[in-house]
Amino acid sequence: KDFDGKKLKCCTKEGLDIHHSEEAKKDFETLKAEYEGLCKVIKDVLHKKVEKVVVGQRITDSPCVLVTSEFGWSANMERIMKAQALRDNSMTSYMLSKKIMEINARHPIISALKQKADADKSDKTVKYLIWLLFDTSLLTSGFALEEPTTFSKRIHRMIKLGLSIDEEENNDIDLPPLEETVDATDSKMEEVD
């Protein structure tokens, strides 16, 4: 696949090579070394959901993105193949390879997450944030959520956290009383002969 003497490459797959100056390459190598610990923490939390976590240079606005392996299916192809009625399940499981998470080390969310993870790797909030980032990057990268209910629970938990609502607080909602049951003797229904 060539165009005008240049090789075309899918930007949603791993191995996208963006040509930069020597100084930019050195800066990127420094960032990779600095964020290696966070990449390991994210990989440990996501475990089998991602093949690896790397510092990427393809994104500028998002905190992270999910890409597929060089020979795996893209997000759109994955969606098409899942919709096939007569699909080959053995081929599907093979081609649905694990995703690769690329983090944007220059994004403020990733920087703050790194500080929080460096302070305490076992913090529950760090784990929730990592899962939330994974789920949102699934959506922004074009993949389907595997567990939408779990995703919405994570969102609700973060909203509670943002609104300073205590997680342990008992959330008894006042429900209207149930309709009273009527005895058979007090029934006002017509009797049938």
Curated annotation (Swiss-Prot):
Positions occupied by motif TPR repeat-binding = 189-193
* Main location class: cytoplasm
InterPro entries cross-referenced by the UniProt entry:
HSP90_C, Hsp90_fam
Gene3D superfamilies assigned to the protein according to its UniProt record, in alphabetical order: Heat shock protein 90, C-terminal domain (1.20.120.790)
Q: Does the keyword Chaperone apply?
A: yes
The UniProt entry, under Pfam families, shows: HSP90
Its subcellular locations are: Cytoplasm
Domain of life of the organism in this record?
Eukaryota
Q: Name one GO cellular component term.
A: cytoplasm
Q: Does the keyword Membrane apply?
A: no
Which stretches does the entry tag as region Disordered?
Answer: 171-193
One GO molecular-function annotation for this sequence?
ATP binding
Per UniProt, the keywords (alphabetical) are: ATP-binding, Chaperone, Cytoplasm, Nucleotide-binding, Stress response
The entry's free-text remark on domains says:
The TPR repeat-binding motif mediates interaction with TPR repeat-containing proteins.
Q: Provide the function of this protein.
A: Molecular chaperone that promotes the maturation, structural maintenance and proper regulation of specific target proteins involved for instance in cell cycle control and signal transduction. Undergoes a functional cycle that is linked to its ATPase activity. This cycle probably induces conformational changes in the client proteins, thereby causing their activation. Interacts dynamically with various co-chaperones that modulate its substrate recognition, ATPase cycle and chaperone function.
Annotated family: Belongs to the heat shock protein 90 family.
Quaternary structure, per UniProt, is: Homodimer.
Tell me the protein's name: Heat shock 90 kDa protein homolog
